[in-house]
C-alpha cells in the first residue's frame, strides 16, 4: 500500500512527442496539475523543439531530436503523442 501511495503522491514525469498546438494545450494543463510535470519533448524539427522547450522551461538534456531517446529515458514516466 505504501508503494502505491508514494507513486500516486509523486509527480508523473511527462514527455511529449510532437510540439504542435494540441501539445501546447496539454503542457498548459500540466502546469495546473498536482500530479504531473512536463519533463521532456521530442521533435525532429529543431526550431519547434527549442521554442517549445524554452516556453515550458524544459532542460536541454530532455529536448530530444529522436523519439526513441525520449521513449528510452528513465526520467520519463509517461508519453503524450501529439
Q: What is each of the regions a protein language model found here?
A:
Residues 61-82:
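Beta-loop-alpha module in the N-terminal Rossmann-like domain of NAD(P)-dependent dehydrogenases
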Amino acid at each position: 500500500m505504501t508503494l502505491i501511495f508514494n507513486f500516486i503522491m509523486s509527480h508523473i514525469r511527462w514527455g511529449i512527442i510532437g510540439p504542435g498546438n494540441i501539445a501546447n494545450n496539454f503542457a498548459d494543463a500540466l502546469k495546473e496539475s498536482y500530479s504531473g510535470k512536463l519533463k521532456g519533448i521530442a521533435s525532429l524539427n529543431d526550431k519547434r523543439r527549442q521554442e517549445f522547450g524554452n516556453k515550458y522551461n524544459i532542460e536541454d538534456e530532455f529536448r530530444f531530436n529522436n523519439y526513441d531517446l525520449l521513449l528510452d529515458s528513465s526520467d520519463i514516466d509517461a508519453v503524450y503523442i501529439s
